[in-house]
Amino acid sequence: MSIRVVKEKELKKYIPEIDFKEAGQELIEEMEKDSDEMFAITLDEKVIGVTYIDDEDNGAYITVNIFKAYRNKGYGAEALKEIEKMIKSKKIIAIYGYHNEIAKQFLVKRGYKPTWASTMMRYNGEKFEVPNISVRQYRDEDYNDAFALADEAFHRMRVGTGCFPDSQLSKPSEESRQRWLKYAEDEFVMELDGEIVGYADVEDEELDTVSIKISHQNKGLGKAFIKYMTNRLIDRGVKEPILWCVVGNVNARHIYDSLGYKEVFCVGYADKKTQK
């Protein structure tokens, strides 16, 4: 038996072998665009699975998917060993189907520690009736206020889920300021009596983030902002807007459910430190 992890073009032809509920949309999208991060898992030169490897300085993200006809034969374990040899980072983050207990235990048995999970949700309804709120496009002079409210809101969320014990507030920087300015056309702020109380951004079909200033939460502003931003995506021609909700973020999940967003799939993340 010779399991190898190799580059191969046109991996999208293997998409019919992939279970969407297991792999999730992102892996399939990477296969469709023939991403540089996609590799074939081969057995004696025959493709028996695929893997996604994004090896960055702060951690390597991987997904391993063995086609069903080749499972329960030890090929997944051998493939994971080969993938780990390729990783240069000191930490590996394995992505798996959160509701797939077999996949979770497969990783745990090999030294990975499940840390957190996130659910992709999709909306396929009509435009919302939105309360009278003041929303405008983000401007550079908004940076300090918008950054501070978004950073604190997400820090509180991370701590609240119990999945991010090392979460800390970030500091504003010129680098992040320029990055925000670069994508200003996709960023929006909500104002109340001249004060910035909300920030949101979109990317393609996705409502990427929505955050409300801590002092103004639990007043219905978040729900109204989500309605407004969903409508913006629909106005851009997006037929089914999507968003992600961290598992354990109970308040946000309740809002999304009440608005008609439906769970599509849920991905889990498991970490392992390497010896490098």
Task: Describe each model-derived feature in a short phrase.
Residues W116-E141, I242-V250, K262, C266-K276:
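C-terminal "cap" of GNAT-fold acetyltransferases
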Residues M1-Y14, S134-V159:
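A short beta-loop-alpha structural element at the N-terminal edge
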Residues E8-M31, H155-R177:
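Conserved GNAT-fold acetyl-CoA-binding loop/helix
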Residues R71-I133, A270-D271:
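Acyl-donor-binding surface of acyltransferase catalytic domains
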